[in-house]
Amino acid sequence: RNGIKVEQALDDFQITAAQDYRSGRTLKKTFIQGTYIVTTQQPKHLLINTIMARNLEIEDSVMYDMATWSAPLAYNLDAYSTTGGYTVKTKQVSQEVAFNGSVINNEAQYAYVIDWSQRNAPQALAQLWAKKYNVRSAFEPFYVGDQTFSAGTLIVLRGRNLERKDQMDQEIKAIAQNAGVEIMGFNSGRVMAGMDLANGRNVPIKQPKVALLVEPPFSTYTAGQIYFLFDWQTGLPIDRIKATALQQSSSPKFGGRSRSVDLKDYDVLILPNGGSGLSELFKEEALDEIKDWVNEGGTLIATEGAASFFTKESSDFTEISLKKYPKDSSLMARSLPYDQRTAYEGKKRIPGTALNAKIDITHPLAFGLKAELYTLKFGTDVLLSNAALETVGSYGTLNQLNVAGYASPENLSHLAGNTFAGVVSMGRGKVVYLIDNTQYRMFWMGPSRMMQNAVMQIPGY
């Protein structure tokens, strides 16, 4: 699309000085056949460096948007760079790489299985739900031959879907093609290692009824990103509800004229990034109603500013505490000339910086992810560890935390080792905290599986 030449290796090859994007270390590395190669020895080298370089030099302390635009980081890819030479035969990639779906054993006698680590697995689940299939989620990884199926893998048992037995094979084939996933058919429920397909610990997951709050005090940007993620990319319908509807007993749905809003109609409530108006919207009575709804089995997903608000200090909604960065009351801050304050404050901000994160991939919120993740950080809010908090995503160690972009040593020390993604059980329901934007501008997509899991997997667990 942008006139950049991309090549693919026809053989295995080795680079003696390859810099690992994740750790920053330079090492000898062997790459397998099929590896994609983008050389900077081409006319679009400036564009390539802008979107592919691990880090860019930043001279100013004040930035408009974000401090890194590295595509390998944004999509959480395993990537390396080198300034040295290498030798390998290549072919030019002339067409966009498509996710071609397929079914292995299309007349399976027992079950069909979709590995949840596939990029488009959530789309497949949405399509299964649309056709009223009963689906289970694998509680832990299992192994068949030399293939690993990750935790969260979708299991469609033939015996649990007898009403669709006549059309199942054709519908499964169509879903594989439409979603662009590989589906494997099983003639038996037995596996080589791990829990068998019909094991009771593999959890039934049903299509949730999902509501997304929109309009002030919530960010229209974040709300739009979340809606786009589900409505367009995943194909899972969600209702947009005006935030003010929570303050009224009978108010129209977003885009509707007569239907009223009742939290009991929903299984999942998503709160986008919100600002100072949250305390006005969520007064004691509203908080009590939401707490009752969660206790009865609802899943509350609070993101960014809304996640910060639903902590003990701001709303007393849970026992989870927010670690706030201490206010600068130094003599220097108080005595700065007016024309120096913007630059001084800019150095204390985190303007969209890529940080290394550790992920608990055994938790349903992280199903399908790798154990390491690049999260995009704005601001300094972070959750403190708590016995009630199931920590799923935490910032890395101080010496490896900052991958790309700017963050002061004080900010990095403040964040290191603390939690940005976690889950709290409350009665029969759950509160999901996502301090960082998991799908920023639908560009920083590496963490987006957490949002999909929060909606599609968490309610079943």
Predicted regions and their residues:
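Intrinsic-disorder/low-complexity accessory segments
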Residues: 1-461
